[in-house]
């Protein structure tokens, strides 16, 4: 009976050949088991900063802000021709607050008659570019550097501009000149009285009136100027300003 046993031995050979496939699958499972726990340390690392408070609530450490500008932004402020000479004369006073305080890059483009502002890698305030634009724009509207720089220090200051003819469209010629003179007063006394009573700054450029101050103070100054344009006596306007100033002192 050698033949049956020989057949049985031959049948055992393919089984032995299949053994490496079994070991390969077991190795694959082992390698898969070795790779599966790899993300576990990362998850634990993410929660490493977590702690539990007294009420069993998770408390995470706040994410720190990098404080860097992600992209470069630019602004261009046009300068009127009659303000180019004052801009050149006061340039040593204008650019230091923009560069040192707001960390902006600034240059005066004489050819295009504009002041160009740009953020840098040192800019940390997201509103620095807007503040710088407001500061330069206030100077181009006629305000002094010392008055315009208040826009960088205070956040509740606004600029309001309007034309004298917007108040009374029938003003022409001498009537328009007379209205401008009523706003300014003799030696600028009326304008100074409005500024001191309303805590604002007023600029007269031709037929345009520009006011710088807080929102509530802008309304007080504009109401006084509109009354003068419409023909109210200066004495009556002074009296109303005194009443408003006394009320403001009582509040504060």
Curated annotation (Swiss-Prot):
Subcellular location as annotated: Cytoplasm; Nucleus, Nucleolus
Protein's UniProt keywords contain Transport: no
Task performed by this protein: Required for small ribosomal subunit (SSU) synthesis. Has a role in the processing of early nucleolar and late cytoplasmic pre-RNA species.
UniProt record, GO biological process: endonucleolytic cleavage in ITS1 to separate SSU-rRNA from 5.8S rRNA and LSU-rRNA from tricistronic rRNA transcript (SSU-rRNA, 5.8S rRNA, LSU-rRNA); endonucleolytic cleavage to generate mature 5'-end of SSU-rRNA from (SSU-rRNA, 5.8S rRNA, LSU-rRNA); proteasome assembly; ribosomal small subunit export from nucleus; ribosome assembly
Chief localization: cytoplasm
Keyword set, alphabetical order: Cytoplasm, Nucleus, Ribosome biogenesis, RNA-binding
Leader sequence segment: none
Compositional bias segments (type: Polar residues): 22-32
KH domain segment(s): 173-225
InterPro entries: KH-I_PNO1_first, KH_dom_type_1_sf, KH_PNO1_2nd
GO molecular function: rRNA primary transcript binding; unfolded protein binding
GO annotation, cellular component aspect: cytoplasm; nucleolus; nucleus
Lineage: Eukaryota, Fungi, Dikarya, Ascomycota, Pezizomycotina
Region named Disordered: 1-57
Record field: compositional bias (Basic and acidic residues): 46-57
Oligomeric and partner information: Component of the small ribosomal subunit, ribosomal RNA processing complex (SSU RRP complex).
Source species of the chain: Aspergillus fumigatus (strain ATCC MYA-4609 / CBS 101355 / FGSC A1100 / Af293)
Family per similarity comment: Belongs to the PNO1 family.
Protein name: Pre-rRNA-processing protein pno1
